[in-house]
């Protein structure tokens, strides 16, 4: 064939600057696109062989070679796939590939950065011009009698094609890198990108550096393969003083190691995978050497093809930020991390891989949001996670409880974000009580003397004509076992129980549960003084008790300079407690909501959010205040009792803590003087 020259299109002059702009953050995708093309060529070659349209050599093994050459500033991609004739180069490169790039541009031109294309797929061969000033193709088709073809283009606007000199079936693409992209001729940078996108492609991928000095290894002679390049045969004599026959060794050129695991774990049958396989794969992909708690192996062929593995990592419940990483693949080619349009938002705390060949990729993120197929994929993934959790709850309760503290934030978040998921797992929710035993919601209701949903429903059926309000069962909870230990001890002494809700998500979650279950009300242990903690006031003492209560209210309001302070006087069964602070559940929820929305600096008092002071009428210090209203130590004692009550309720502000410490020192010095005076009087 003679030399053929041509122009692609006048519009092409505008394509590449715009493409570079839009895929700037993923500037390295050209490697994925070119390797994917080579992978497709090998796959087609194998299919033609299976169909009897060609015959592969007996020792055929599909492979892709990537060769960096920093001296010549080039990057080569070589595959032994199907190859192309001159007509096919004309069709696929000059027409179809260019058309694909044009369509890519059309999709992109009206997109904002918030509505980017998923994975930038569809750019294909022309992604090479993002990094190269010149691109050359040398190819030879598998077809009998086909001539080799050499194609070259500078800048992607004009091309020249003539007969080439390639002798092996396949394609070689050479990129002459521009000055801004020379880093891709570095072996380490190329390896980084290949491992990012191509670690699990179904074809072996080898990376090498042009003109590099060969590396060698020594192996047993019996292990030499036909493909090995033997440099030297070595006879190793036994060491002095040792018996045995001489060992025959061979020095060979070091065997290349593929960067691609062509049979990743998610493509295998779950029954063929061991625990060690799953853990090893997790560590390899996520570079996390802590073991995951457990995992779910997804394997679906109908109505769509989806495979993958989702891992439940150990979550640190002390922090707000819970971030996982789910990698999305298409036929073992990496697309992107954490595509929230495909993967339900609450699953983003997990780690895993999902491979869905049927997923539309050459569309924008906004288009995916309204795609019915994508919705089905997300629903399926959510259902499989719920099924796994329910299965563990029913058949492996011991381990489920062991994992609960780590997985509960994820499950609660899932309930808040996905109503279907919440409905599926509602019976598998657990609550840890003060004895660190795990209860279901129904267990909690029964433990607090309430009726379960089934019992309530049965009563309503029996007396359907009478309309009555559903009785609510209070479920008490604590958020900080150390800070609220005073209340916990009082509860335990009276045989009361509470559940531990220590994670930041729990405030929203209990509101969600109250909306779902109208027979349940959650109340923090210090929201009020439970009746079981109070002693009854004798009838003959009630008048005096009320007078003392009024007097104490007046004294504390005056000393604390707070006329709005709510003071309640109770006879507590625990005589060791002088004062307590309580904040109604409604006020606390309002306070937490304000903090969540960045309104923490506002005065919560305007919403009735001030803590009430509870004084124990039977405590000596409280009695001292009543009996010595004008005493010199009354002000000191009142302020100290108030701060002690707050300390068991919440942390003091820096100013409050400073004043509290100063008063504590004053009390100790006063006690020291008193003891010293007594000693001297003896």
Regions found by a protein language model. Name each.
Residues 1-185, 192, 199, 217, ...:
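GHKL (Bergerat-fold) ATPase N-terminal catalytic module, capturing the glycine-rich phosphate-binding loop
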Residues 676-682:
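Positively charged, low-complexity/disordered segments
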């Amino acid at each position: 064939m003679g030399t053929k020259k041509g122009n692609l299109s006048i519009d092409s002059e505008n394509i590449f600057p715009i493409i570079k702009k839009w895929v700037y953050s993923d500037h390295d995708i050209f490697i994925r696109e070119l390797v994917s093309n080579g992978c497709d060529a090998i796959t087609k070659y194998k299919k033609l062989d299976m169909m009897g349209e060609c015959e592969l050599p007996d020792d055929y093994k599909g492979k892709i070679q990537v060769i960096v050459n920093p001296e010549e500033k080039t990057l080569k991609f070589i595959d032994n796939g199907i190859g192309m004739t001159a007509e096919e180069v004309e069709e696929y490169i000059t027409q179809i590939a260019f058309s694909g790039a044009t369509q890519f541009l059309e999709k992109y031109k009206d997109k904002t950065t918030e509505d980017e294309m998923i994975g930038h797929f569809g750019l294909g061969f022309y992604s090479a011009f993002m990094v190269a000033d010149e691109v050359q193709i040398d190819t030879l088709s598998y077809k009998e009698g086909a001539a080799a073809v050499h194609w070259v283009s500078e800048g992607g606007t004009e091309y020249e094609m003539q007969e080439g000199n390639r002798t092996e079936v396949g394609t070689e693409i050479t990129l002459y890198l521009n000055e801004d992209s020379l880093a891709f001729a570095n072996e380490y940078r190329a390896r980084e990108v290949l491992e990012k996108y191509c670690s699990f492609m179904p074809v072996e991928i080898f990376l090498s550096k042009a003109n590099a000095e060969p590396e060698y290894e020594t192996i047993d002679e019996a292990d030499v393969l036909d493909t090995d390049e033997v440099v030297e045969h070595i006879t190793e004599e036994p060491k002095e003083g040792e018996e045995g026959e001489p060992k025959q060794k061979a020095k060979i050129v070091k065997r290349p190691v593929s960067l691609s695991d062509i049979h990743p774990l998610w493509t295998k049958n779950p029954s063929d995978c061991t625990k060690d396989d799953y853990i090893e794969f997790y560590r390899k992909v996520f570079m996390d050497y802590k073991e995951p708690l457990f995992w779910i192996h997804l394997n679906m062929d109908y109505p769509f093809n989806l495979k993958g593995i989702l891992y439940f990592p150990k979550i640190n419940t002390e922090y707000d930020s819970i971030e996982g990483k789910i990698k999305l693949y298409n036929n073992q080619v990496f697309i992107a991390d954490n595509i929230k349009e495909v993967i339900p938002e609450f699953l983003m705390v997990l780690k895993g891989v999902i491979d869905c060949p049927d997923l539309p990729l050459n569309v924008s993120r906004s288009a995916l949001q309204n795609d019915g197929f994508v919705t089905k994929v997300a629903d399926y993934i959510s259902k499989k996670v719920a099924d796994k959790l329910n299965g563990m709850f029913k058949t492996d309760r011991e381990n489920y409880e062991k994992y609960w503290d780590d997985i509960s934030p994820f499950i609660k978040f899932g309930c808040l974000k996905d109503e279907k998921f919440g409905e599926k797992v509602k019976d598998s929710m657990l609550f840890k009580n003060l004895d660190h035993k795990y209860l279901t919601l129904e267990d909690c209701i029964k433990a607090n003397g309430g009726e379960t949903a089934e019992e309530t429903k049965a009563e309503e059926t029996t007396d359907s004509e009478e309309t009555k309000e559903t009785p609510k069962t209070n479920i008490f909870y604590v958020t900080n076992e150390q800070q609220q230990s005073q209340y916990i001890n009082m509860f335990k002494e009276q045989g009361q129980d509470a559940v531990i809700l220590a994670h930041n998500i729990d405030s929203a979650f209990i509101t969600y549960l109250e909306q779902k279950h109208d027979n349940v009300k959650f109340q923090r242990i210090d929201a009020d003084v439970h009746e079981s903690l109070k002693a009854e006031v004798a009838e003959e003492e009630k008048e005096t008790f009320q007078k003392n209560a009024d007097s104490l209210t007046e004294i504390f309001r005056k000393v604390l300079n707070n006329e709005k302070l709510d003071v309640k006087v109770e006879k507590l069964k625990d005589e060791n407690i002088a004062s307590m602070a309580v904040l109604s559940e409604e006020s606390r929820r309002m306070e937490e909501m304000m903090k969540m929305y960045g309104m923490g600096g506002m005065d919560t008092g305007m919403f009735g959010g001030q803590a009430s002071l509870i004084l124990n009428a039977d405590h000596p210090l409280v009695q001292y205040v009543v009996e010595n209203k004008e005493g010199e130590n009354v002000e000191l004692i009142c302020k100290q009792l108030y701060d002690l009550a707050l300390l068991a309720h919440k942390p003091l502000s820096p100013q409050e803590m400073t004043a509290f410490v100063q008063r504590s020192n004053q009390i100790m010095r006063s006690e020291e003087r008193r003891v010293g005076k007594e000693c001297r009087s003896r």
